[in-house]
C-alpha cells in the first residue's frame, strides 16, 4: 500500500468511527438560526441574540452599511442593522460570517487551500444565486427559494474543512499537496453530508454537501444541487 493510500485509509477509518474532528457552528450562530426560525421573534429580540457576540454585531453593522444593501444613510447600531437587513436574511448572513471564520489556518500550505476553498464557495454562491433568480422568474410555482440556495451554496463544500484541519494538526503526515487533492476528491462529499447531519440541517442541504460532485447522483425533479454544480 502506498503512503497516500495509507493516509486515506486513516481518514476513512476516522470517518467511519466518528473520530474525525468536524467543524462546529458558534453557539451564537446556532441561536440566531433558531431565533430566525421562530415565527414569534421580532427584530428587537433578534438584536438581543446577536448582541451577545460583539464580533458578530460589528460584522452585521458592516453588512448593513455595505453597498449590497444599497442605502446611502449609514446605520450606527445593531438594532438599525438588523432592521435594515431583515429577519429573513439574518440567518444566512450569520452563517456566512461563521463559515468564513472556519476557513483559516496558521499553516501556509493549508492556509492556501483554505483560501482557495472559501473563494470557490463565494464564486459558486454568486453564480448559484443568479441562476436561481433566473429560474424563479420562469417557474413561479416552484418550492425552491432564494434563501435556501444561498445557504446551500455556502455549505456545499464544507466537507473539505475536516480534511484540511487534520492536515494542519499533523502536517508532517497529511500536509502533502498530492495527498490533499486526492483526499478532498474522494472524501469531502461523505464528510460534508456528515457535517450537515451533525449541524441538524434539513435533508436538502445534506444532499447538496454529500453529492454535489457526484455526476451519477440524479434527482427526480429540479433541486438545489442542480444550481450548485
Identify the residue ranges that each predicted region occupies:
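Conserved alpha-helical "signature site"
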Residues: 1-155, 162-169, 175-183, 187-229
Amino acid at each position: 500500500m502506498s503512503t497516500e493510500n495509507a493516509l486515506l485509509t486513516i481518514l476513512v477509518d476516522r470517518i467511519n468511527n466518528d473520530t474525525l474532528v468536524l467543524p462546529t457552528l458558534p453557539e451564537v450562530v446556532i441561536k440566531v438560526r433558531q431565533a430566525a426560525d421562530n415565527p414569534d421573534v421580532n427584530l428587537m429580540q433578534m438584536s438581543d441574540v446577536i448582541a451577545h457576540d460583539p464580533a458578530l454585531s460589528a460584522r452585521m453593522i458592516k453588512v448593513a452599511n455595505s453597498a449590497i444593501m444599497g442605502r446611502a444613510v449609514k446605520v450606527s447600531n445593531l438594532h438599525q442593522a438588523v432592521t435594515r437587513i431583515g429577519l429573513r436574511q439574518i440567518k444566512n448572513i450569520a452563517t456566512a460570517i461563521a463559515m468564513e471564520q472556519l476557513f483559516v489556518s496558521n499553516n501556509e500550505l493549508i492556509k492556501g487551500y483554505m483560501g482557495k476553498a472559501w473563494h470557490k464557495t463565494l464564486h459558486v454562491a454568486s453564480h448559484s444565486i443568479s441562476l436561481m433568480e433566473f429560474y424563479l422568474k420562469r417557474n413561479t410555482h416552484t418550492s425552491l427559494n432564494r434563501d435556501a440556495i444561498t445557504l446551500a451554496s455556502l455549505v456545499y463544500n464544507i466537507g473539505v474543512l475536516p480534511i484540511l484541519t487534520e492536515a494542519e494538526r499533523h502536517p508532517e503526515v497529511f500536509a502533502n499537496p498530492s495527498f490533499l487533492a486526492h483526499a478532498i476528491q474522494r472524501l469531502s462529499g461523505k464528510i460534508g453530508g456528515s457535517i450537515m447531519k451533525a449541524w441538524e440541517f434539513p435533508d436538502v442541504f445534506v444532499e447538496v454537501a454529500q453529492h454535489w460532485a457526484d455526476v451519477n447522483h440524479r434527482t427526480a425533479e429540479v433541486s438545489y444541487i442542480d444550481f450548485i454544480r
